[in-house]
Amino acid sequence: ISGGSKKSAEGKLSYMISGSQKAFEVAKPILDCTSETVFEFGEHVGSGSAMKAVNQMLAGVHIAAMAEAITFGITQGIDPKRFLEVISKCAGTSWMLENRTPHIIDNDYSPKSSINIWPKDLGIVLDIAKNSNFSAPLTAAALQQFISAAGSGLGQEDDAAVAKIYARNAGIKLPQN
């Protein structure tokens, strides 16, 4: 499942599922009323979970990369609002950047998706990678930033609060409103 609590409340989740056709047919009415998109991955058990792991890998890395980029930009004198305006129209954008950067600009870290989910989710991704003998250094680096944020007491805040770790380490202030 992908989409978080907001999309869940709107019935706009994305499901990545695998299993028997019979199980899918039984679940279809529920899937249809709670989702915007259902991706089927055949009957091989675990294929949908594998896709979810890939999605979480990208999402977590994108959030950490956004936090790193905006704080780096601030150290270079770039206004955070201008950062969002420009990057959202350039090759460096991502859905996570466009969705999470406003949280930093508005100094609003009320949890839409909390820091605390990322040590779990990226930990699972890295366990899968390890079991597959796959090196995932970007994911490992993102995980360390989320662990640092959780260990600094930010675990219940929105996952955009990982930018506070970058800001602390750089000796800068994020927007305060």
Question: Where do the protein language model's features map onto the residues?
Answer:
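NAD(P)-dependent dehydrogenase/reductase Rossmann-like domain
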Residues: E43, G151-N177
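Small-residue-rich helix-loop
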Residues: I78-C90
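Short amphipathic alpha-helical surface patches that mediate protein-protein
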Residues: D32, S88-K89, L143-I147, A167
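Rossmann-fold dinucleotide-binding core
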Residues: I1-Q56, G60
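Interdomain hinge/lid region at the active-site interface
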Residues: V45, S49, T93-A160
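Short phosphate-engaging motifs
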Residues: K22-A23, A65, D79, T93
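N-terminal glycine-rich phosphate-binding loop for ADP-containing cofactors
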Residues: E10-L13, C33-T37, M51-Q76, K81, ...
